[in-house]
Amino acid sequence: MTPVVALVGRPNVGKSTLFNRLTRTRDALVADFPGLTRDRKYGQAKLGELEFIVVDTGGIDGTEEGIELKMAEQSLLAIEEADVVLFMVDARAGLTAADQAIAEHLRKTHKKVFLVANKTDGIDGDSAVSEFYGLALGEVYQMAAAHGRGVLSLLELALAPHLETLVDAATQETAQDEEEEDFDEEALLRMVAAGELDTKEDTKETPFADLPIKFAIVGRPNVGKSTLTNRMLGEDRVIVYDMPGTTRDSVYIPMERDEQKYVIIDTAGVRRRGKVHETVEKFSVIKTLKAIEDANVCLLVIDAQETITDQDLSILGFVLNTGRSVVLVVNKWDGLDQKVKEDVKNELDRRLGFIDFARVHFISALHGSGVGHLFESIQEAYQSATRRTSTAMLTRIMQMAQEDHQPPMVNGRRVKLKYAHAGGYNPPRIVIHGNQLNDLPDSYKRYLINYFRKSLKIMGTPVRVEFQESANPFEGKKNTLTLSQERQRKRLLKAKAKK
């Protein structure tokens, strides 16, 4: 489960500075959602290989009107759903009444809170932070967010349990990969040169084959997510089911269809069918982001009557950035006349042409039309994302791509692609080795991605292709001269000296 870190504190203590430092590898992901203040920020950050969501809660000032009145509803929700809370104070300004009011609220939440004294650069930090121990929140961690001092050590401490879980999972996956495929690079290159690649048993079932497919139904409020969830589950089912460990997260609902097990991750709060008429869905950005991270496949629900909005694109961008498979679901399709339907399809083609690999379904969640076909696309996307393909097959496809369209010339030399192998799954990641790959134009990279996608019949999931320069075996080595070459060199040097 992707951890969530909430940044809490009164204005101007450095929350935005820390937020920008943590999310430097990615832009802020979500903004302008209904019910959120304009300065609310949600972003994705990384600590090593651990991805986590960071939330700048903002809007907390703890004035005499009371912390409960001045804290926005979404800020309360962010703190409630966070795994870790970083309570930031200003070491230069000292302890204020606002800090005390916020601390009092945080103590009531029983959350794991780290008290962070920011702006300790250029001052005696130990003396400056001493008064903050009176907040009774334990150790006070010194930081200079503007310069990055103290940030890494604090994150490693705060996210230690999640890092341990990640290391354990990575160790198991590495061991499994080593068992499944261990190729000799030199032997492979000889086979490539001799045209002896064996592409039999080119694909194999993954260790995910027996696991249920987790899919998340995501989208803006009031596009019909709850209606679709209930329709997919069936009318007569008691549908509220919290699996262990999900009390603060979305509802996880196990189900089975045609002997295939699924888990629906519902972000809207699932209701009995009799209550589907309620117009306002409980909506949490954090729940949506965490559901996307945890899912294998995401069903992005779009309102046909409103077509594509910037909010839809924001959610879609997060899905693609996290590498999740996606199925586009255009809901409320019934009742539209033919002219409007054509306009909607044209708008989808115009604004979503960059994800032509995703299946698009036009449905009515309320009446059930088209809903049954969603399961076919979910399975297709999941199998495409998790199928394992041999090095021999990937290398052969790469060769065919070169035969159909040669790489360009760079500085008078043609870019050379040597071999390809799998670098990961969910999403599929292909690593290509060769020479001068750093000079390969983006247009040819896109060509290769599309060629692999078409050859492997990959639908519903992004494909990532990485390029690695092959090592030069002579780099850093001096050329050893033979005895006759050494004598000739000495004669030339002596003749040059006489001149």
From Swiss-Prot:
A Pfam family recorded for this sequence: MMR_HSR1
Identify the residues that bind GTP 1. Answer: 9-16, 56-60, 118-121
Database matches in Gene3D superfamilies: 3.30.300.20, P-loop containing nucleotide triphosphate hydrolases
Q: Which InterPro entries match?
A: G_ENGA (IPR031166), GTP-bd (IPR006073), GTPase_Der (IPR016484), KH_dom-like (IPR032859), KH_dom-like_a/b (IPR015946), P-loop_NTPase (IPR027417), Small_GTP-bd (IPR005225)
Which residues does the UniProt record annotate as the domain EngA-type G?
3-166, 213-386
Q: Which UniProt keywords apply?
A: GTP-binding, Nucleotide-binding, Repeat, Ribosome biogenesis
**UniProt entry tagged with the keyword Repressor:** no
Q: Where does GTP 2 bind?
A: 219-226, 266-270, 331-334
Which residue range or ranges hold the KH-like domain? 387-471
Q: Which residues form a coiled coil?
A: none
Q: S-adenosyl-L-methionine among the record's keywords?
A: no
What job does the chain carry out?
GTPase that plays an essential role in the late steps of ribosome biogenesis.
Q: Oligomeric state and partners? A: Associates with the 50S ribosomal subunit.
Q: Family, per the entry?
A: Belongs to the TRAFAC class TrmE-Era-EngA-EngB-Septin-like GTPase superfamily. EngA (Der) GTPase family.
What this protein is called in its record is: GTPase Der
Q: Whose protein is this, by species?
A: Aeromonas hydrophila subsp. hydrophila (strain ATCC 7966 / DSM 30187 / BCRC 13018 / CCUG 14551 / JCM 1027 / KCTC 2358 / NCIMB 9240 / NCTC 8049)
> What gene is it encoded by?
der
